[in-house]
Amino acid sequence: MHTVCETHAFRAAAQAAGMDDDELEELVELLGANPMAGDVMQGTGGCRKLRFARKGMGKSKGYRTITLYSGERMPVFLLTVFGKGQKVNLSKAERNQLKKVVDQIVDAYAQKAPLVGEVK
């Protein structure tokens, strides 16, 4: 099971999209078991877009979650989420902004996470 981290932006977006705690827990379990779920989004630095079903509905009417998984040494980051009715795809400007966020996360995490077997 892989660690999953929720960003503040994700929490705010999840509330705006109407995602409840049970749905969030299900999403975390899914990503913990399969951190590479979803399709890689070009121009985002490795973000993935995962279609996730709303309670009582299918994936086609569900959520679009944007996640980052950058390898075994890092957790899966929940970056944002939106309902299909809110938006279908991200604009080029939004993808560029995600790339900047990804770079900041990877840089910050790399400075704090020792290599496996490294002694501090």
Spans of features found by a protein language model:
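Basic/aromatic recognition patch in beta-strand/loop cores that engages polyanionic ligands
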Residues: 38-81, 86
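Short, well-structured alpha-helical segments
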Residues: 24-28, 32
